[in-house]
Amino acid sequence: MEHKEPWRATLLTIFPEMFPGPLGLSLAGRALEEGKWALDAVDIRGFASGKHRSVDDSPFGGGAGMVMRPDVLDAAIHGTPAPGPLVYMTPRGRLLNQDLVRELAAGPGVRVLCGRFEGVDQRLLEAHGALEVSAGDFVLSGGEPAALVMLDAIVRLLPGVIGKEESLAEESFEWGSLEYPHYTRPQVWDGRTVPEVLLSGHHEKIRAWRKRQAEDITRQRRPDLWDRYVAAKNLSEG
């Protein structure tokens, strides 16, 4: 029987010691130990030349900060063969959402370029057809924290990582809406009680309540998601 290689994340970074970081713990960590996915953190400086192994230089046209050199990054990419698309973490990229996470999880893996300083020479991104991805509308000190967020979201979707598939199916974004509220023991806490319907044992009523809650939360907090959810619902209902 042909052995299937695990889904692989290859990180190109000047701080390889940041990985696996939190990905070495909990669900992702156990899955990593069990070989359900693999991770390689590659030090970009290992592909730089000169005494100081510099990976950056001043920008043409002037301006603040430094830019990561295309020749050094190109050597790192070619020197580290790995499956999957080259992903560059940047605030100007395609917004990371559950659709993109599913798309990346369905492939053989990803190569993630973690930028630093003012960013990466544009020619490098064009030469390699990099997929630019943003973790959100904010700026970080580098691409590593954003890469950790993206990889955690991906690993959760890999086969065998989460025991109950229904846990995935009921999470935020899986059906286009945010998730409903959760409750556990004690039944009364700080004068607040669990909604009666959840104690009823009536599964259909519980499902209907959870659906209403999810829809209300989505409509109130994320009108952009709500509009898409309603459009998709109307389309499915014909």
Curated annotation (Swiss-Prot):
Coiled coil: none annotated. GO terms for cellular component: cytosol. The keyword Transferase applies. It is an enzyme of class 2 (transferase). It comes from the Bacteria. It is found in: Cytoplasm. SUPFAM superfamilies: alpha/beta knot. GO terms for biological process: tRNA N1-guanine methylation. GO terms for molecular function: tRNA (guanine(37)-N1)-methyltransferase activity. Keywords: Cytoplasm, Methyltransferase, S-adenosyl-L-methionine, Transferase, tRNA processing. CDD domains: TrmD-like. The keyword Transferase applies. InterPro entries: Alpha/beta_knot_MTases (IPR029028), tRNA_m1G_MeTrfase_C_sf (IPR023148), tRNA_m1G_MeTrfase_TrmD (IPR002649), tRNA_m1G_MTases_N (IPR029026), tRNA_MeTrfase_TRMD/TRM10 (IPR016009). S-adenosyl-L-methionine binds at residue 115. Its EC number is 2.1.1.228. Belongs to the RNA methyltransferase TrmD family. Homodimer. This is tRNA (guanine-N(1)-)-methyltransferase. The lineage of its organism: Bacteria, Pseudomonadati, Pseudomonadota, Alphaproteobacteria, Rhodospirillales. The gene is trmD.
